């Protein structure tokens, strides 16, 4: 998995439809490679010592230089060879938006055809700056309360497209790893299910945590999953980042409505996989369980008591108080949704039940909702391959039709 990637052949066409060979398509995008992959590329393809790869990696991820000619401590002969067989191709910024609260959102074009685009969000806070990164164009899991799900699914992002989001944001922010940090945390909580794009996500997270990359500690990189049990087990053996689970319901009946994946991996199996994750990764002492609160759906007191019991069971299984942390997320509405945000009174009452049960529970402050950058609102631009967009539009039209008739 860590070897240098072989870029698939890509061709363009003339106006008459005849294929034209693309020199760019044959070049290795160095953003695809982690440290080991870059070392192998320099040794096997360029015939260079591995330490030369370290020089170039720092130019790319510390100084945000994409032009080999600007890498002044790299010899001219090597720069010439790099120009011939490699490139640093970063995502193109379609537009960026600033929120009144300081949140920043980028729409980034993906792929050579530029038809698809994903969203990346930077959330500044006191003493920290968190980047929310996407892993797929769209999402195939169809969670009913998530805006991304209404867009359908196109494809997985490449490693370069994932780490390219970090590159674009870090460059914009003037981030200097190990010195002037504006980017202190990365959360794989953007568009898509990260564990359905396992290899590319793990490789990108390796660059995020590498001292030659962005130098983030393992605990400052968080992967959020809807609950692919076998892949959580695999992740435990290949990475030790922080784990978050999109739970959103305390029982299987309700969770199957909100997160259809629960039909395949019910809560008991999901919780067991989280226990195994912490058992393997001794440096991690907790799992964060995300719970989006929706009015009249999952925000009742009985739901809070059920959730508290589930979290206590997890703490007992791990024999660690606070092994389960709950992140309560007020629902962020989007066009066409049938859900509403819980009232502030109900949110605080829900949290109090958890706190009274000695469960660590915090309410996530809504950020960036004025630019549709809040949790659950990311949408991007997806050429749907699942026909879900059409189904969602029909649902909205049917609902509008009923309202008009009434």
Swiss-Prot record:
Keyword Iron-sulfur: yes
Sites where the protein binds [4Fe-4S] cluster: 139, 143, 146
Main subcellular location: cytoplasm
EC assignment: 2.1.1.192
Record InterPro entries: Aldolase_TIM, Methyltransferase_A, RlmN_N, RNA_MTrfase_RlmN, rRNA_lsu_MTrfase_RlmN/Cfr, rSAM
GO molecular function: 4 iron, 4 sulfur cluster binding; metal ion binding; rRNA (adenine(2503)-C2-)-methyltransferase activity; rRNA binding; tRNA (adenine(37)-C2)-methyltransferase activity; tRNA binding
Disulfide topology: 132-375
Known cofactor(s): [4Fe-4S] cluster
GO cellular component terms, semicolon-separated: cytoplasm
Gene3D superfamilies on file: 1.10.150.530, Aldolase class I
Positions of S-adenosyl-L-methionine binding: 192-193, 224, 246-248, 332
Assigned keywords, A-Z: 4Fe-4S, Cytoplasm, Disulfide bond, Iron, Iron-sulfur, Metal-binding, Methyltransferase, rRNA processing, S-adenosyl-L-methionine, Transferase, tRNA processing
Catalysed conversion reaction: adenosine(2503) in 23S rRNA + 2 reduced [2Fe-2S]-[ferredoxin] + 2 S-adenosyl-L-methionine = 2-methyladenosine(2503) in 23S rRNA + 5'-deoxyadenosine + L-methionine + 2 oxidized [2Fe-2S]-[ferredoxin] + S-adenosyl-L-homocysteine; adenosine(37) in tRNA + 2 reduced [2Fe-2S]-[ferredoxin] + 2 S-adenosyl-L-methionine = 2-methyladenosine(37) in tRNA + 5'-deoxyadenosine + L-methionine + 2 oxidized [2Fe-2S]-[ferredoxin] + S-adenosyl-L-homocysteine
UniProt key word rRNA processing: yes
Domain Radical SAM core: 125-370
Principal EC category: transferase
Domain of life: Bacteria
Family: Belongs to the radical SAM superfamily. RlmN family.
Biological role stated in the UniProt entry: Specifically methylates position 2 of adenine 2503 in 23S rRNA and position 2 of adenine 37 in tRNAs. m2A2503 modification seems to play a crucial role in the proofreading step occurring at the peptidyl transferase center and thus would serve to optimize ribosomal fidelity.
PANTHER family the record matches: 23S RRNA METHYLTRANSFERASE, RADICAL SAM CORE DOMAIN-CONTAINING PROTEIN
Descriptive protein name: Dual-specificity RNA methyltransferase RlmN
Species this protein is from: Xylella fastidiosa (strain M12)
Gene symbol of the encoding locus: rlmN
């Amino acid at each position: 998995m860590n070897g240098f990637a072989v870029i698939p052949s890509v061709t363009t066409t003339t106006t008459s439809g005849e294929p034209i060979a693309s020199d760019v398509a044959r070049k290795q995008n160095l953003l695809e490679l982690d440290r080991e992959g870059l070392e192998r590329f320099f040794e096997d393809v360029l015939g260079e010592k591995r330490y030369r790869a370290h020089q170039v990696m720092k130019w790319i991820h510390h100084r945000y230089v994409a032009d080999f000619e600007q890498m002044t401590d790299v010899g001219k002969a090597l720069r010439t060879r790099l120009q011939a067989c490699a490139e640093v191709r970063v995502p193109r910024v379609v537009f960026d938006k600033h929120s009144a609260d300081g949140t920043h959102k980028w729409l980034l074009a993906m792929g050579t055809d530029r038809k698809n685009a994903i969203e990346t969000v930077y959330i500044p806070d006191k003493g920290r700056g968190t980047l929310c990164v996407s892993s797929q164009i769209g999402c195939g899991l169809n969670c009913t309360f998530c805006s991304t799900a209404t867009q359908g699914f196109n494809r997985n992002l490449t490693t370069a497209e994932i780490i390219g989001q970090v590159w674009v944001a870090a460059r914009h922010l003037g981030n200097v790893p190990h010195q002037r940090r504006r980017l202190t945390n990365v959360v794989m909580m953007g568009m898509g299910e990260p564990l359905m794009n396992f290899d590319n996500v793990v490789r990108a997270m390796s660059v995020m945590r590498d001292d030659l990359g962005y130098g983030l500690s393992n605990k400052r990189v968080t992967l959020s999953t809807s609950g692919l049990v076998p892949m959580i087990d695999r992740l435990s053996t290949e990475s030790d980042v922080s784990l978050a689970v999109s739970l959103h319901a305390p029982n299987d009946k309700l969770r199957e409505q909100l997160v259809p994946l629960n039909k395949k991996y019910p809560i008991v199996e999901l919780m067991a996989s989280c226990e195994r994750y912490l058992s393997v990764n001794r440096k991690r002492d907790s799992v964060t369980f995300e719970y989006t609160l929706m009015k009249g759906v999952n925000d009742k007191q009985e739901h809070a008591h059920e959730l508290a019991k589930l979290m206590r069971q997890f703490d007992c299984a791990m024999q660690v108080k606070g092994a389960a942390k709950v992140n309560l997320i007020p629902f962020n509405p989007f066009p066409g949704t049938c859900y509403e945000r819980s009232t502030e009174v109900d949110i605080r009452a829900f949290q109090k039940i958890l706190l009274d049960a000695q469960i660590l529970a915090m309410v996530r402050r809504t950020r960036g909702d004025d630019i549709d950058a809040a949790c659950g609102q990311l949408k991007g631009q997806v050429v749907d391959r699942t026909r879900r967009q059409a189904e969602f539009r029909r649902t909205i039209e049917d609902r509008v039709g009923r309202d008009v008739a009434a």
